[in-house]
Swiss-Prot record:
One of its GO terms (cellular component) is basement membrane. SUPFAM superfamilies: TNF-like. Pfam families: C1q, Collagen. Keywords: Angiogenesis, Basement membrane, Cell adhesion, Collagen, Extracellular matrix, Hydroxylation, Repeat, Secreted, Signal. It comes from Mus musculus. It is found in: Secreted, Extracellular space, Extracellular matrix, Basement membrane. Residues 169-191, 298-307, 470-507, 548-557 have a biased composition (Low complexity). This is Collagen alpha-1(VIII) chain.
Length: 744
């Protein structure tokens, strides 16, 4: 049976149109839509709802001016070849508007051109059913909402008052107050201290008179300078030999320290005797010292809150000091719901796959295809559909982790002491039991009466020798020995070093009376009058100075001044001809025993083979700060060490040449106080103390003149750990010096 050709042509046209519509949908957008760049978020008006999670109803998104336009702004859903979830999918194909050139169907068998088949505009169709929820929209950029009103005031907290705080820092100095009114006129003050004597007045006119008598003898003049040393006198005759002297024995020395304990003697034989009767209980001992604080008890239960008392009168008081921060209180109850927070920042763009396509609808009854009319105009945009109902609330979330433990509670109150039970009756006297094991040593009891004298024990072994005792007191000086023979006058010695500056001498005698002065000052003011009544007058001129007061008592001698600048260099020394005995110092004087040694103190050999005339002198510096306490300070860097009498390894100067020596030390103080002592033979001669100030480097000095004999030792030592801040550095030198003033 043949089919009419016209229906076949219409079916071909419909098939071509459906293929074109499917191709456009599969390409990703209608009308050639291009995807947007992902980095530029579109500006969505605030009335468009925010992104909502999948599974909830999304309100219909209007198109046109109120929503996303159907142009190039539509974002591209990049999910490969998956079909977008569209309301037209698998439904009736809506009329597709053609933009630009009209679609001209291909010419083939049975095809008829449609240019002349333009029909009239059809009636407006009814709104279709609500489609499935569309893809999630882009995140909105909303404006922050208006700040909410403050919530109601919370209830006042309940807590214990804190401890009084530490005293605050002193406040800043206040502004000067207003100037006060002028006070009443004061009384006339007492007489002031007489002022210093004024300068002598000008010379008066020469008087006319007779020459006076001879004046009183003047005061003796000042002591003249010492004259030059005269030539040595001729040697005197040898005197008779004196009688033999005798010396008194010295006092016994101090008792030495006790010797070491000897080893314990052998154990004695066990005693034989019956155990004594149990003694009466001793008196009750004194109350023991309180024991150490016990461990904190377990946390007590929370007490019942007390009844709130009536409100007291408003107190008036000064603010107390800041209290010590108390212990953390118990965690408070859950507060009321706070104000709604400000809207958060926009979330990240949602990522979700399009939903599953809906079920395929039933196929309708095929109608007779009508004649294809011309292209109609675009119909008006339909009204947006109503929003879907809200979804059901979700399931409750997983409970959160347990919070941190609360703070330690306050210790509970101390329990009351129990009732002391009644004292039991004394039991019967028991029989003496067997000898028990030796018990632990008991507490020291009261001293009992002295027992009977025991038998003498065996002689113990000889104990070790005790420590050497301290040197005894110096003996009584012996009688004066016989006068020695006068020695031969020696050669003139070298010029000695400059001596220590002497103490300032007393004031000189009063000078002769001066020329009569001018007219004397007015007399002393009279006694104070009665207080006057009136405003204070203008300040008067400064009165003349009063008469000088009486000469006061002589003041205490001042502290020794700082050492003066070094003097000019002296004349070149004249080296005397060395004696054949090789004496290194001229005229060494007598020895300790009154007899001049035969060869005195020989000097060391010089570069050219002759004796070197070295003086016992030294200067040493400290290189290691904070030396140990209780031992001689080791000044280990030598600047000069004549005759090698100072040992830098021990810090001790040992006298070789007897005589009068001058010692000086200069120390620095840092990090603590410093207290040093100058020792002579383990005996402190003088102390020097300096107090340390934080942030400062202080100094202290000391000097002394000592008489030394051969073998005497001199050194510096710090006697206390509490003042051991002796410091030294690369450019901060602490030094110790000494030299011979003159031999004996």
């Amino acid at each position: 049976m043949a089919v009419p050709p016209r229906p076949l042509q219409l079916l071909g046209i419909l098939f071509i149109i459906s293929l074109n519509s499917v191709r456009l949908i599969q390409a990703g957008a209608y009308y050639g839509i291009k995807p947007l760049p992902p980095q530029i978020p579109p500006q969505i008006p605030p009335q468009i709802p925010q992104y909502q999670p999948l599974g909830q109803q999304v309100p219909h998104m209007p198109l046109g001016k109120d929503g996303l336009s159907m142009g190039k702004e539509m974002p591209h859903m990049q999910y490969g070849k998956e079909y977008p979830h569209l309301p037209q999918y698998m439904k009736e194909i809506p009329p597709v508007p053609r933009m630009g050139k009209e679609v001209v169907p291909k010419k083939g068998k049975g095809e008829v051109p449609l240019a002349s088949l333009r029909g009239e505009q059809g009636p407006r169709g009814e709104p279709g059913p609500r489609g499935p929820p569309g893809p999630p929209g882009l995140p909105g950029h909303g404006m922050p909402g208006i700040k909410g009103k403050p919530g109601p005031q919370g209830y006042p907290g309940i807590g214990k008052p804190g401890m009084p705080g530490m005293p605050g820092k002193p406040g800043a100095m206040g502004m000067p107050g207003a100037k006060g009114e002028i006070g009443p006129k004061g009384e006339i003050g007492p007489m002031g201290i007489p002022g210093p004597q004024g300068p002598p007045g000008p010379h008066g006119l020469p008087g006319i008179g007779k020459p006076g008598g001879p004046g009183l003898p003047g005061q003796p003049g000042a002591k003249g300078e010492r004259g030059p040393k005269g030539p040595p006198g001729p040697p005197g005759l040898q005197g008779p030999k004196g009688e033999k002297g005798f010396g008194m024995p010295g006092l016994p020395g101090l008792k030495g320290p006790p010797g070491m304990h000897g080893p314990p003697g052998p154990v004695g034989l066990p005693g034989v005797g019956k155990p004594g009767v149990t003694g009466f209980p001793g008196p009750q001992g004194p109350l023991g010292k309180p024991g150490p604080p016990g461990e904190p008890g377990p946390q007590g239960l929370i007490g019942v809150p007390g009844v709130q008392g009536p409100p007291g009168m408003p107190g008036v008081g000064k603010p107390g000091q800041d209290g010590i921060p108390g212990q953390p209180g118990f965690p408070g109850g859950k507060g009321e719901q706070g104000l709604p927070g400000l809207p958060g920042p926009p979330g990240l763009p949602g990522v979700g796959k399009p939903g599953f396509p809906g079920p395929k609808g039933d196929r309708g009854i095929g109608g007779v295809p009508g004649v294809l009319g011309p292209r109609g105009e675009k119909g008006p945009i339909g009204a947006p559909g109503m929003g879907g109902p809200p979804g059901e609330p979700g399931l409750p979330g997983i409970p959160g982790p347990m919070g941190p433990p609360g703070a330690i509670g306050f210790p509970g109150p101390k329990g009351e002491g129990g009732v002391v039970g009644p004292q039991g009756p004394p039991g019967p006297k028991g029989e003496p039991g067997l000898q028990g094991f030796p018990g632990k040593p008991g507490f020291l009891g009261e001293v009992g009466p002295p027992g009977m004298r025991g038998l003498p024990g065996p002689i113990g072994p000889k104990g070790e020798g005790g420590h050497k005792g301290l040197p005894g007191l110096p003996g009584v000086p012996g009688l004066l020995g016989p006068k020695g023979e006068p020695g031969i006058p020696g050669d003139q010695g070298l010029q000695g070093p400059p001596g220590i500056p002497g103490i300032v001498g007393p004031s000189g005698p009063i000078g002769p009376p001066g020329i009569p002065g001018p007219k004397g000052e007015p007399g002393l003011p009279g006694p104070p009058g009665f207080p006057g009544v009136g405003k204070p007058g203008v300040a008067g001129l400064h009165g003349p100075p009063g008469k000088p007061g009486a000469l006061g008592p002589q003041g205490q001698p001042g502290l020794p001044g700082p050492p003066g600048p070094p003097g000019p260099p002296g004349p070149p020394a004249v080296m005397p001809t060395p004696s054949p005995q090789g004496e290194y110092l001229p005229d060494m004087g007598l020895g300790i025993d009154g007899v001049k040694p035969p060869h005195a103190y020989a000097g060391k050999k010089g570069k050219h083979g002759g004796p070197a005339y070295e003086m016992p002198a030294f200067t040493a510096e400290l290189t290691v700060p904070f030396p140990p306490v209780g031992a001689p300070v080791k000044f280990d860097k030598l600047l000069y060490n004549g005759r090698q009498n100072y040992n830098p390894q021990t810090g001790i100067f040992t006298c070789e040449v007897p005589g009068v020596y001058y010692f000086a030390y200069h120390v620095h103080c840092k990090g603590g106080n410093v207290w040093v002592a100058l020792f002579k033979n383990n005996e402190p001669m003088m102390y020097t103390y300096d107090e340390y100030k934080k942030g400062f480097l202080d100094q202290a000095s000391g000097s002394a003149v000592l008489l030394l004999r051969p073998g005497d030792q001199v050194f510096l030592q710090m006697p206390s750990e509490q003042a051991a801040g002796l410091y030294a550095g690369q450019y901060v030198h602490s030094s110790f010096s000494g030299y011979l003033l003159y031999p004996m």
